[in-house]
Amino acid sequence: MTQQIKTCKRKVMDDEFYTMYKDVVRELHKYDLRNKRIICPCDNKNSNIYKYLKDCYYDVKCDDREWKNIDYSKYDIVITNPPFSQVREFIRYLISIKIDFIIIVSDVLRYGIKNNKTNFGIGIYKGKDAQKFYRPDGTITAVHCGWISNIKDDWEENEKL
């Protein structure tokens, strides 16, 4: 195998982090997703984000196409764990098409709240609380990351009910 192919394969693996079910529950259960058409453009039907949303009987779809080639007008919200190497471009795109989103980003504090277009999600995980992810090789690794969203913080109101 040439060095270039080895480097490319390593880069792809280094961009693959699969969210654990408990971390999905910890974040998403606080949002009111009833009657929302949800797309998970960077996940497949084996992802824990998709499984959680299906377990809660939400209207959720995965799409095998590249995230740039999806017709988002059919959906109300994007919930996904995008490839960390593409997250900046992905966020810019979602903001430009004015669709609600809840996504996981690595090194969340770097993104912060930009021009009042995104908010921190409920969970930001650093240090000993870093969120754990499955890797393609079956190992588990901790990543400093968090959820961001452009949805109004209605979960605070839901907590009071």
Give names to the regions the model predicted.
Residues 1-77, 83-161:
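Class I S-adenosyl-L-methionine-dependent methyltransferase catalytic core
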